UniProtKB/Swiss-Prot annotation:
The lineage of its organism: Bacteria, Bacillati, Cyanobacteriota, Cyanophyceae, Synechococcales. HAMAP family: Ribosomal_uL18_B. One of its GO terms (biological process) is translation. Residues 1-25 are annotated as: Disordered. Residues 1-21 have a biased composition (Basic residues). This is one of the proteins that bind and probably mediate the attachment of the 5S RNA into the large ribosomal subunit, where it forms part of the central protuberance. It comes from the Bacteria. This is Large ribosomal subunit protein uL18. PANTHER family: 39S RIBOSOMAL PROTEIN L18, MITOCHONDRIAL, LARGE RIBOSOMAL SUBUNIT PROTEIN UL18M. The gene is rplR. GO terms for cellular component: cytosolic large ribosomal subunit.
Amino acid sequence: MSKLSRKQQTQKRHRRLRRHITGTSNRPRLAVFRSNNHIYAQLIDDAAQSTLCSASTVDKELRSGLKNNAGSCDASVAVGALVAKRAIAKGIEQVVFDRGGNLYHGRIKALADAAREAGLQF
């Protein structure tokens, strides 16, 4: 049996997590995707299969302020604050956090903490 790559391990964890985590219109799922260069966050209503709002380091609002640091913890903090601001503007205050199979530390934790500080509850 061959050893799984890091990406395969992440995908396996994500499939395992998604069995138990679902988002509704009242309490959507805050899904986080982390790549080497960027980080993406979206609020998803799984019942309606729709994205309610999203934010990422490729957004025009954040891109100019980040320069070449889109893969840093500071960028994750900015994305977390922006997605929380957009969610609260739509009347969403409670979410279910989906770390996307990634370990809860570093950039994922920074995004979650910033979203909590900006007013989201999870």
